[in-house]
């Protein structure tokens, strides 16, 4: 297989998923899950199943839980994501909630490197040598009762507090290209050691 053919294979959906899986597989496997039980599903399968939620265009982890045993979904999980056993909604949350988000950054870096070496990003140059990057924030979690030390805080006029997590997402785009390439998302949280809450108040009167 020539170099060009090898690069083309790596840049296919199957090739990029295989690359991501190889990186996820390098993450240390915890001896026990959050319940203190030895995991029966490898961490790499939990991560690839979570990635499949997006690839299979499922709206939530709960919908994934309801579809994971459907023959077509099982086939895609096996053939594309190489998942031998998909976790249920609860198991996936428990395993991934304990994972440091920074540990998955190498997967984004590796795919971006493949796109650079394969000259794919040349097709996304705009106004000369620039890349267009679209950014947006998204809410991940909000509660007035459940919170952690990294939660942002929104103090309301009635004295109540809303605790929330948000994330900044960014993708490389081009007006003439259908595909977009996500960059590693960045969690939005209080700075280390900060005790100052978010004072923006209610967004609507």
Residue ranges of predicted features:
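Boundary/linker elements of alpha-helical solenoid repeat scaffolds
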Residues: 6-7
């Amino acid at each position: 297989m020539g170099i060009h053919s090898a690069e083309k294979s790596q840049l296919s959906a199957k090739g990029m998923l295989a690359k991501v899986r190889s990186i996820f597989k390098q993450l240390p496997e915890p001896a026990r899950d959050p319940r203190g039980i030895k995991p029966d599903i490898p961490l790499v399968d939990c991560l690839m199943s979570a990635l499949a939620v997006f690839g299979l265009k499922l709206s939530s982890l709960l919908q994934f839980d309801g579809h994971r045993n459907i023959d077509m979904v099982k086939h895609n999980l096996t053939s594309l994501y190489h998942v031998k056993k998909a976790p249920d909604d609860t198991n996936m949350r428990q395993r991934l909630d304990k994972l440091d988000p920074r540990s998955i950054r190498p997967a984004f870096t590796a795919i971006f490197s493949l796109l650079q070496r394969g000259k794919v990003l040349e097709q996304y140059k705009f106004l000369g040598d620039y890349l267009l990057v679209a950014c947006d924030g998204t809410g991940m979690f909000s509660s007035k009762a459940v919170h952690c030390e990294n939660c942002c805080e929104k103090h309301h006029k009635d004295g109540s507090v809303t605790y929330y997590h948000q994330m900044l997402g960014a993708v490389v785009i081009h007006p003439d290209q259908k595909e977009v390439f996500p960059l590693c998302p960045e969690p939005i949280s209080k700075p280390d050691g900060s005790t100052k809450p978010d004072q923006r108040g209610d967004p609507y009167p």
